């Protein structure tokens, strides 16, 4: 990783000097004759060319288009806030009071533990800031696949395409064994909350979305004493995951998604939408698979044989239609590419 960065810096420096000198020579050729030789004039012209290049805005990535670039869609510009931090780490482990009070109401937690003490203990166990997704650079072009769990993935044959991405983000149960041709086999990051936890491969980063203080407490004990085994349903006492692979989704970012992108629809965002907006902030190119109904209008998971098994959509917690429209709008303005499946 470091070697690649150094190489990129060298390439950029060489290109910068080459372009500057070439630009100067071409410009100078049109202004003076071969018989004119004024060192002061040459230096002045060269300095002016350098100033022009420095003023040229630096793009946030090396892709043909970068998600975070503004000015293409007013709808997007009014919602996207590049200052929002999707990860909660030891460096920013402070939840603003308004975000904290809003977050506490999501699942009606009673008598929560002190949040500051909880975060201090948590980041004494996990580093929370050593993941490739947390490293950004203007010389990169990060291609991310966000893979949902819709039944429209069945017989889609998207597997190879999904696996070709730099990062593959999945969520909740999301089995891959037996479904590789449709959903792929590669996973780099997996979104979970305590009630949806599944054992992951050793090289997969686990992004925990906390909806209450108890969720953060669960991570602490699941990696140490194993004392918590129940939230509102049974949860594992212990989890098998490397501590450096545990990442925390920022509660303030959940509020940002709810207010900016959902416009306060539903009680709070689904894991699916949280993962899509998360990807907008950490990736340069985002391709979305496995969202929405199948071609027959059924809302179910790709591993379910019962096509009508879509009761999860009627819980009243999430506004599925509004969330899906947000995804479609992002696709229509070419901030993401949306694969509809079958």
UniProtKB/Swiss-Prot annotation:
It comes from the Eukaryota. One of its GO terms (biological process) is N-acetylneuraminate metabolic process. InterPro entries: Beta-gal_alpha2-3_sialyltrans, Glyco_trans_29, GT29-like_sf, Sialyl_trans. Coiled coil: none annotated. The soluble form derives from the membrane form by proteolytic processing. Belongs to the glycosyltransferase 29 family. This is CMP-N-acetylneuraminate-beta-galactosamide-alpha-2,3-sialyltransferase 1. It comes from Gallus gallus. The lineage of its organism: Eukaryota, Metazoa, Chordata, Craniata, Vertebrata. The gene is ST3GAL1.
């Amino acid at each position: 990783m470091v070697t690649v960065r150094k190489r990129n810096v060298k390439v950029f420096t060489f290109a910068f000097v080459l372009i500057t000198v070439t630009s100067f020579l071409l410009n100078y050729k049109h202004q003076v004759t071969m018989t004119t030789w004024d060192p002061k004039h040459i230096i002045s012209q060269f300095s002016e060319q350098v100033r022009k290049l420095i003023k040229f805005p630096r793009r946030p990535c090396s892709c043909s288009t970068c998600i975070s670039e503004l000015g293409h869609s007013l709808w997007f510009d009014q919602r996207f806030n590049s200052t929002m931090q999707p990860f909660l780490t030891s460096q920013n482990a402070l939840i603003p009071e308004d975000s904290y009070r809003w977050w506490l109401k999501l699942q009606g937690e009673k008598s929560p533990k002190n949040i500051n003490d909880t975060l201090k203990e948590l980041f004494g166990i996990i580093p929370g800031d050593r993941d490739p997704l947390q490293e950004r650079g203007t010389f990169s072009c990060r291609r991310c696949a966000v893979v949902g769990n819709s039944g429209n993935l069945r017989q889609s044959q998207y597997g190879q395409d999904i696996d070709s991405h730099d990062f593959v983000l999945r969520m909740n149960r999301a089995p891959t064994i037996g479904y590789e041709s449709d959903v792929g086999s590669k996973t780099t990051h997996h979104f979970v909350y305590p009630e949806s936890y599944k054992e992951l491969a050793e090289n997969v980063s686990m992004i925990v979305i906390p909806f209450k203080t108890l969720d953060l407490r669960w991570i602490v004990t699941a990696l140490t004493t194993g004392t918590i085994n129940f939230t509102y349903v049974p949860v594992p006492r212990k989890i098998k995951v490397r501590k450096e692979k545990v990442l925390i989704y920022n509660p303030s970012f959940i509020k940002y998604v709810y207010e900016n992108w959902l416009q306060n629809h539903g009680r709070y965002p689904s894991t699916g939408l949280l993962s899509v907006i998360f990807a907008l902030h950490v990736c340069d190119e985002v391709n979305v698979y496995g969202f929405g109904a199948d071609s027959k209008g059924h809302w179910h998971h790709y591993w379910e044989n019962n096509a009508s098994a879509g009761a999860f959509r009627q819980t009243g917690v999430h506004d599925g239609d509004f969330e899906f429209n947000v995804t479609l709008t992002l696709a229509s303005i070419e901030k993401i590419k949306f694969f509809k499946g079958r």
